């Protein structure tokens, strides 16, 4: 028995440790919280939303990208629907829309209105067969139409005289001057032949100023990721997502250190070398190394730490999250590949600990599921608002069969769930939640004396605490009369 005990490693999680405060010359508002999701994708805040059907669809992904993070669209959707969610994010705003939605002059008004409603846009350029700009149709043109006008062509209503356009190569600052001078809302970009090449809107100029920290690609579009599995339709799903403009693919499984996942990563990288791939989940250095050597551009770490996950209890498998992060980081460091801490984050202080332990970013589910933008249903219980939150290993999530392969159960007639369905308190706007989380991160970095996340990882010193130390860390010997937005007790 003594020999067995010597072989058993100790596993620690966030509540087992604290960061030691150190000499600091940096204030919280001075720290740089930017990081890299992969070598090519920079985030302005180290927050990624979980690919869960009660957490991330287009609305939340847009809100998070505007704050500087990135959302991962869940895969519990048909391929076409998931691609549409990605497309909504990519088309939500742009420095310049490279391939703007257009209509032909003979397009019916009803069809044009449907297109505008689908993409939540207030107007569309009208082009001929050669894509030469011949007019523009906006809400103002359609403001006083009657029901009998729905079947008429847009050419009867579009603005075609004195169109204001701009040449290729125009800067956003120059475009802003044109908007101001002519008091227009949309500026088509055309080449020397008059063919449409892009579109700049006043809304994008306004959003650029309103969300200066937004996470955007080189074309000024918000970044977004999407999850895929390991099933037979995976490459078809990836193809549709890439066509929609996805920035990163996440091979999302419960056990990333497996033959099927490794082969899937290799296939995606071979067929779509232009897209970055994140793979997971793993909890060991060996699993991390295997995924990196298969071609993963980042590795997702976490087996069973999530609030709605029962893997550790049902299967008896897992590694406490802090130890898992440290082990994975030690392996990833040799390849200069980022890792993402997925699960177990309850407070902003846990984010600081996860990053200090070696993660480049954290993936959040529970902390974001209660936001207004999350797709979970809003319910009321005893006079208080909640939002539905469920694990992707829950019976409800797996019943669609689209996510059951995450737990290797896609061919089973009766599922063995590794997650539960529950509710979390409604928290309001995502921006307010993220503000508190990033504020806590900034404070933690200030205490450690770290100007950026790299310095945090270099300077971090952990101290292990006892149960008494943990109890002392929380509010004690008092009744809370006014709750804080960044602290709660179970």
UniProtKB/Swiss-Prot annotation:
IMP binds at residues 307, 342-344, 365-366, 389-393, 418. InterPro entries: Aldolase_TIM, CBS_dom, CBS_dom_sf, IMP_DH, IMP_DH/GMP_Rdtase_CS, IMP_DH_GMPRt. Keywords: CBS domain, GMP biosynthesis, Metal-binding, NAD, Oxidoreductase, Potassium, Purine biosynthesis, Repeat. Mycophenolic acid (MPA) is a non-competitive inhibitor that prevents formation of the closed enzyme conformation by binding to the same site as the amobile flap. In contrast, mizoribine monophosphate (MZP) is a competitive inhibitor that induces the closed conformation. MPA is a potent inhibitor of mammalian IMPDHs but a poor inhibitor of the bacterial enzymes. MZP is a more potent inhibitor of bacterial IMPDH. Residues 96-154, 158-218 form the CBS domain. Pathway: Purine metabolism; XMP biosynthesis via de novo pathway; XMP from IMP: step 1/1. Its cofactor is K(+). Its EC number is 1.1.1.205. One of its GO terms (molecular function) is nucleotide binding. SMART domains: CBS (SM00116), IMPDH (SM01240). The active site is at residues 309, 406. One of its GO terms (biological process) is GMP biosynthetic process. K(+) binds at residues 304, 306, 309, 472-474. Belongs to the IMPDH/GMPR family. Homotetramer. This is Inosine-5'-monophosphate dehydrogenase.
């Amino acid at each position: 028995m003594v020999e067995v005990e010597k072989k058993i490693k100790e596993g620690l999680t966030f509540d087992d440790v604290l960061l030691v405060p150190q000499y600091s010359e940096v204030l919280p508002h001075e720290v740089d919280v930017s990081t890299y999701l992969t070598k090519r994708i920079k985030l302005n805040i180290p927050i990624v939303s979980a690919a869960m059907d009660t957490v991330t669809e287009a609305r939340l992904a847009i809100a998070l990208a505007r704050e500087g993070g990135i959302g991962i669209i869940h895969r519990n959707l048909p391929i076409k629907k998931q691609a549409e969610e990605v497309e909504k994010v990519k088309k939500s705003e742009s420095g310049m829309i490279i391939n703007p939605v257009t209509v032909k002059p003979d397009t019916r008004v009803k069809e044009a209105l449907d297109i505008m409603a689908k993409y939540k846009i207030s107007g569309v350029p009208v082009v001929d067969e050669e894509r030469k700009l011949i007019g523009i149709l906006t809400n103002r043109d359609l403001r006083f139409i009657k029901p009998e006008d729905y079947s008429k062509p847009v050419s009867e209503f579009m603005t075609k005289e004195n169109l204001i356009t701009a040449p290729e190569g125009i800067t956003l600052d120059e475009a802003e001057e044109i908007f101001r001078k002519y008091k227009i809302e949309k500026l088509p970009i055309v080449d020397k032949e008059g063919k449409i090449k892009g579109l700049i809107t006043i809304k994008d100029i306004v959003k650029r100023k309103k969300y200066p920290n937004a996470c955007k690609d080189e074309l000024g579009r918000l970044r977004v990721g999407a999850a895929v599995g390991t099933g037979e339709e995976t490459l078809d799903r990836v193809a549709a997502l890439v066509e929609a403009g996805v920035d990163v693919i996440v091979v999302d499984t419960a056990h990333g250190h497996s033959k099927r996942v490794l082969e899937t990563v290799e296939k995606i990288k071979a067929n779509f070398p232009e897209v970055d791939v994140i793979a997971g989940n793993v909890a060991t250095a060996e699993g991390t190394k295997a995924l990196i050597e298969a071609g993963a551009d980042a590795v997702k770490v976490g087996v069973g730490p999530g609030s709605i996950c029962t893997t550790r209890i049902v299967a008896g498998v897992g590694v406490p999250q802090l130890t898992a992060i440290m082990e994975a980081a030690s392996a990833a460091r040799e390849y200069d590949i980022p890792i993402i801490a997925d699960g177990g984050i309850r407070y902003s202080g846990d984010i600081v600990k996860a990053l200090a332990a070696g993660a480049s970013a954290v993936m959040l589910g529970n902390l974001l599921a209660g936001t207004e933008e999350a797709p979970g249903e809003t319910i009321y219980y005893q006079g208080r608002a909640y939002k539905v939150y469920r694990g992707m290993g829950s019976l409800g999530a797996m019943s669609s069969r689209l996510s059951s392969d995450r737990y290797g159960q896609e061919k089973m007639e009766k599922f063995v769930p590794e997650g539960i369905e529950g509710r979390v308190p409604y928290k309001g706007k995502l921006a307010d939640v993220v503000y508190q989380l990033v504020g806590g991160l900034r404070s933690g970095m200030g205490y450690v004396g770290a100007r950026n996340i790299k310095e945090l990882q270099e300077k971090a010193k952990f101290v292990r605490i006892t149960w008494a130390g943990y109890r002392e860390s929380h509010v004690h010997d008092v009744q809370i009369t006014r709750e804080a937005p960044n602290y709660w007790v179970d």
